[in-house]
Structure formats: structure tokens, C-alpha cells
């Protein structure tokens, strides 16, 4: 939830798509995230904003005077610098002029941890490539019933063809 009482949370989903690192298209990502987190489904923003600047402009145009952006720990410094550098500046991305811009980390992952704590999108993609549904399922929230469908969608979007077990062949025709 928002850091300040009465704050509204918006979740902006990446529009990026490529077979290797971002296999799902935007609409599919939004649909899966809404299913994974039904309590926050209305907070998942379907906005054309594709960059941090476009997100900031979108929020400013909605009347927000202050923002707290939560991002991966590896992006905090970069996003804080960029958002503050262009705050109050008319540029090609548009204009935003917030009283306060704060960028905070979504938290650090322990890559060596087991289960959800150590899970990452990279590990989930790797499990999908390896055909390891059980490991893939460790990366989805408890209660999410479409893990196998998500797994198949990720594999398909990565260009991985499903293999069917045809059984053993022990007799040959001449």
C-alpha cells in the first residue's frame, strides 16, 4: 500500500517484449498479474506509459503532487537521479512537476534462498526452458491456479515447442 495514509497505489506493467527476457506480451502480463494478485487487480494500471518519464507524466496529469516509486534494487539510484533531474522540466517526454519524488527498493532477493524468496524472473525463464514445471511453480504466489498455463505461455512465447512422449517403440516395420 501507499507509504502515506490515503495514498493510492498504481502498478505499471512493462510493455517490453522479446522471446529471451520478456516473453509475454503486455496484455498477457496484465492478465496474469491481476489473477495472481486479485486484491490489487484494480491497481494494475493499463496505461500507454512505457518509460519512467511517461509514468511520471501520467501520474502528474492525474493530479498527484508527490510520488513514491517502488522499483528493483538495481534501478533505485538511476531512477531517482533521472526523475529528479527532469522534475519541473518540459522535455520530449512531457512535463511533470512533483513536490516530492522518492524512489525506493522493492527489496533485495537472496539468490541462494530456496522457494519464493530466492526466485527471480531469470530463474523462472530458466525453469521454463529446462521443462521444469515444479521449479517454475515455486515462483508464483500460493493460491494461483494457472501456474501451468503461465508456464506453457512462457515456453510458447520463448519459441519452445512442446514435446509429446510417444512411448517406447520396440517393434519395427520392414
Where are these regions (language model features)?
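Nucleotidyltransferase catalytic core that binds NTPs
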Residues: 1-173
Amino acid at each position: 500500500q501507499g507509504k502515506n495514509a490515503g495514498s493510492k497505489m498504481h502498478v505499471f506493467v512493462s510493455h517490453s517484449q522479446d522471446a529471451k527476457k520478456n516473453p509475454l506480451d503486455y496484455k498477457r502480463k496484465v492478465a496474469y498479474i491481476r489473477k495472481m494478485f486479485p486484491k490489487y487487480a484494480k491497481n494494475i494500471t493499463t496505461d500507454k506509459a512505457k518509460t519512467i518519464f511517461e509514468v511520471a507524466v501520467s501520474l502528474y496529469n492525474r493530479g498527484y503532487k508527490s510520488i513514491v516509486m517502488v522499483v528493483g534494487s538495481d534501478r533505485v539510484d538511476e531512477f531517482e537521479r533521472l526523475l529528479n533531474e527532469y522534475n519541473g522540466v518540459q522535455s520530449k517526454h512531457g512535463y511533470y512537476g512533483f513536490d516530492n519524488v522518492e524512489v525506493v527498493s522493492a527489496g533485495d532477493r537472496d539468490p541462494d534462498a530456496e522457494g519464493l524468496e530466492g526466485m527471480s524472473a531469470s530463474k523462472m525463464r530458466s525453469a521454463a526452458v529446462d521443462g521444469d514445471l515444479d521449479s517454475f511453480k515455486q515462483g508464483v504466489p500460493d493460491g494461483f491456479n494457472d501456474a501451468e498455463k503461465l508456464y506453457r505461455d512462457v515456453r510458447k512465447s520463448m519459441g519452445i515447442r512442446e514435446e509429446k512422449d510417444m512411448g517406447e517403440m520396440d517393434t519395427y516395420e520392414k
